[in-house]
């Protein structure tokens, strides 16, 4: 009797998984994409309150983080797929946003270091006011029009000043409604009110957070911590049996979620 139940369980399970994988195969055939664990958009403040030396410290913080082989070896590579996609945007006033490094696949230490070199080659494009909402509005369609697919899409905003709370929160809410999973913040400076502003108006989505670098000199260490938190996968809460089915279930679940994300991206392109 137990053998019969086990056999029926396996048969039903494999039928379900096969159906899921078949649907995934048909979906991916219509929309070619590179699958990654996370799509991460880095939004870096270059408003007039940031001096040239402070801009260089910000830039160097990201360069050092992606140059560090530990980021890939102990964090990116530990994901289900072992890859991420990332871009970098400089932002300031309402009409001042620039994607200075386009969407890049990080699938090796070399790729991570090449991304660091690309950041290092960037120059400051402008230095006007501080409009966080417009930066988020600018970043969102770039996520939905890239050539990557993931289960987690994250926008990260770093800055040393606040902007209009209503427009900032509205941009955050619109990005989340469009399908972005989380918006995180990195506050530069030791201001409690600025931290609270980011916490209340910028941060949003499941697993989102705000970190604070008390000085620009602390920025590099905080960036490294932030990237690790954004990249690392959460451990599974349960361990189903038998083990041979775990991979099939995981792939099936990834396919279902990614298919939904893909539909959102296709709709955004129309």
Enumerate the predicted regions with their spans:
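VWA/integrin I-like adhesion module and closely mimicked acidic/polar interface patches used
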Residues: 161-201
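Extracytoplasmic/secreted cell-surface and envelope-processing proteins
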Residues: 50-54, 143, 163-170, 193-197, ...
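C-terminal membrane-anchoring or membrane-association module
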Residues: 256-270
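Sec-exported extracytoplasmic/periplasmic mature domains
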Residues: 63-71, 93, 124, 140-148, ...
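Short, threonine-centered small-residue motifs that mark membrane-proximal processing/anchoring sites
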Residues: 7-35, 229-250
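C-terminal "exit" segments of structured domains
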Residues: 19, 206-238
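Von Willebrand factor
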Residues: 34-100, 102-152, 154-158, 184-195, 218, ...
